[in-house]
Amino acid sequence: MKAGVAQTAVYNDIASNLEKISGYIERAGREGLELLCFPECSLSGYIRDFSRVDPSEVEKALQSVHGLALRNKLNVIVGAPRFEEGKIFNSAILLSADGAKLVYDKNFLTSFDKKYFSPGNEGLAFEVGGVKCGVLICRDQNHPSPSQRYAEQGVKAIFILAAHYYPPPEAWEKLDKNRALPIARAVENNVYVFKANAIGSQGTTISLGGSLIVDPRGLVISEADKVNETILSYKVEVQ
């Protein structure tokens, strides 16, 4: 399975995010990727009032992303709010190359998340190219149990969608922690970890990138810088 993460800027404008996501899907298709993961809330923006987001606009954009994924024979994981029965979830949406649409809802919410979102309580495991994969969102990486459950299910690669937006001093202070956690999850569970983080500013906060791919030994195979958009990719081969 050749998989990758897209480190991108994220805006509070769905049309702008859709244009950016579309460009990276086409690039991933040209590069022969089978799976591409985007940051948390990459379709909607993260630092915003989610009660003002139009669910129909989100759904229309997801349909556009899925159509492009299908044309490029690519599985795509995109971050977006999900609206169900009067609740909003911070979700990772898997838009599969075979036409399926699967959902993971963030389990462990930040104080900001709790203003708008309800927590999920289940994982999401799926297979691409013979490799079983799982999904986490941002704060979920702080807790060992979700990754452990995935490993018990035979997952070999975990994809983390992140949006590490903090006030500037805190953003620098959190760099070491947010790099160490995916490495720890990889080593603890003998899995690959692919982490897609956002870059740039939203409001008075910044996200300093550092997306990365880690192997089961804890070796950082590939790592992005703090300011530039990019795709990181690696071919996972499981015996």
Please give the residue ranges for each predicted region.
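Short polar catalytic/cofactor-binding loops
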Residues: 7-13
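Hydrophobic residues at beta-strand termini and immediately following loops
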Residues: 6, 104, 126, 196, ...
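Short, acidic/polar
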Residues: 16-27, 141-149
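Extreme N-terminal starter segment of soluble prokaryotic enzymes
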Residues: 1-4
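Cys-nucleophile CN-hydrolase/nitrilase-fold catalytic domain and related Cys-dependent amidase chemistry
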Residues: 14, 23-97, 165-191
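Short beta-strand scaffold segments in enzyme catalytic cores
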Residues: 78-80, 91-94, 124, 211-213, ...
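Active-site catalytic loop in hydrolytic enzyme cores
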Residues: 83-157, 166, 171-180, 237-238
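CN hydrolase (nitrilase-like) catalytic-core segments centered on the catalytic cysteine
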Residues: 59-77, 142-229
